[in-house]
């Protein structure tokens, strides 16, 4: 094709830039016509020497892209085929309640201007209502809507906000430091120096902002966290993140239930085991990589840095999109979610979910977090979901390829949320 081949790993991590470096002219033209809105919908490897992407341009044109991988793990050919139109993301998204608005807002936190969306009744005649801060997961890349670059717009925090509006609960969700309109702010020159303190500060500032709104009933405040956001929800509600208005209810939606680096280690070892079963790695190579991952975790916990020499690919385990900076990882790992949960004020109402289809962690691991909530004498509503993936969608498959599919949000979770709000907020 007249261009040097690009490693498959680079295509995966930096999809838009690396893909377009080798894309056919017709696809480049389509991308440019789409005002630069190239999105990765799914990625699969049907066999070890083939990577298949499905991508869209501006949500309209969809392409299936086959990228054969040579013996050195490099891509030297591209086959792209346009696909038929698919459903719009809006078709699976709960709608905002009539008479409610989603208002863009800003607030300050730690010297950074945070951009967010305040969802509330459009008329002051509605009086005061309960209100909740919504915290997303996945480090610095997930924005106020629960979306990340290079992925299908899942909009899971939009779904939660719209569900809350239907139940008469206002909400504030925001672009965390490093994401969306907020960006890196004063950390732009050195994002790796941010650590977790800015994320704690913005959670506290968000709750204070919400409590100041004229339509907010300050006696009925809540915080909901998804995935890694669950840790910050616990830090906020317990007061460990900083002084903030008292929270009456906490929602932990498929939260990280154990120390974060333990979770990274477990998921990495599971991936290596699967690769051996599929014939992609030898048992000896997988064992060597597993030992390197264990060394890397020990180093992060001891020094906050990775060892100088690691096998190819292991460092990327801790630097990939959605993981946060190394400093943030090492700092958030200090918190055992169960230990933080045990510090919640007694009788705090807590909605906790786990699912048999969450392939990040199972209900047995979430039981560890539940034990901490029990120790705190929380009013715990522990809901075991059936066939719901990590991103709150109906999907029993545990297939990561489906994370970027347009699937409906969980009706079980919606029912559990409605019941919890009616009883506790």
Which residue stretches match the model-derived regions?
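Accessory cap/linker subdomain of secreted extracellular hydrolases
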Residues: 251-343
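Catalytic active-site module of serine/aspartate enzymes centered on a nucleophile-bearing elbow/loop
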Residues: 388-392, 396-425
